[in-house]
C-alpha cells in the first residue's frame, strides 16, 4: 500500500529532522532494564506470529540520561529490525550489560555492507514496507547522546549500542 508507505516515510523523515535539530530537549534517567522488558512485552505477539522468540540472555541494571521517547524509539527500532529482517522461526537474542545493549538475529547468511547499513534509504532486503530509515534514526539518536552504535557478523547479525562510562 503506497499511501501507508508514504505516511511512514513522512513520519520517519520528520522524526529524523526533529532529532537532528535538537527538538527533543527533555531528558531524564532512563531505566533500560525496565524499558527493555516493556519493549519485549510489546513485541511478543509479533515474534510469536513469526515463530520467533525474543530471548533476554543477560540483563544488568543500567540507566542513562536521555529523552525517554527517543530511548523507546531506539530500543524498538532494534527489535523491530531483527523481527522484520530475521529468519522466521529463529530466536532473537538480547543482552543488556552494564554499559551495552546488543541484539543478535539470524537473517541473510552473509554480513551486511557496513558502509550502507546506517545510510538513509539503503535497504538490504526486499521488504517493500521498509522506509530504509530505521537504522539511520537509531544512528542519529546514538550520535545525539554520544552512544556508539556498531554492527558485526559472527554466526548472526549483531547490533551493539555502547553507552559512555
Predicted regions and their residues:
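Conserved micro-motifs of the catalytic ATP-binding
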Residues: 21-26, 63-69
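Short beta-strand/loop element within the Bergerat-fold HATPase_c
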Residues: 89-100
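Short conserved segment of the HATPase_c
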Residues: 110-121
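Short helix-loop "hinge" at the ATP-lid/N-box region of the Bergerat-fold HATPase_c
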Residues: 81-83
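Glycine-rich ATP-binding loops of the HATPase_c
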Residues: 146-153
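Short alpha-helical segment of the dimerization/phosphotransfer core of two-component systems
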Residues: 1-6
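Conserved catalytic submotifs in the C-terminal HATPase_c
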Residues: 28, 53-63
Amino acid at each position: 500500500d503506497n499511501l501507508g508507505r508514504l505516511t511512514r516515510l513522512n513520519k520517519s523523515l520528520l522524526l529524523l529532522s526533529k532529532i537532528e535539530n535538537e527538538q527533543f530537549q527533555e531528558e531524564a534517567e532512563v531505566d533500560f532494564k525496565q524499558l527493555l522488558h516493556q519493549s519485549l512485552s510489546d513485541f511478543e505477539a509479533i515474534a510469536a506470529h513469526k515463530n520467533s522468540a525474543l530471548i533476554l540472555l543477560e540483563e544488568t541494571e543500567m540507566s542513562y540520561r536521555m529523552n525517554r521517547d527517543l530511548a523507546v524509539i531506539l530500543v524498538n527500532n532494534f527489535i523491530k529490525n531483527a523481527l522484520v529482517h530475521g529468519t522466521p522461526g529463529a530466536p532473537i537474542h538480547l543482552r543488556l550489560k552494564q554499559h551495552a545493549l546488543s541484539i543478535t538475529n539470524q537473517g541473510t547468511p552473509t554480513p551486511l555492507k557496513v558502509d550502507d547499513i546506517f545510510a538513509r534509504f539503503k535497504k538490504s532486503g526486499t521488504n517493500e514496507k521498509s522506509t530504509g530509515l530505521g537504522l539511520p534514526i537509531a544512528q542519529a539518536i546514538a550520535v545525539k547522546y554520544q552512544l556508539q552504535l556498531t554492527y558485526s557478523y559472527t554466526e548472526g547479525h549483531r547490533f551493539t549500542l555502547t553507552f559512555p562510562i
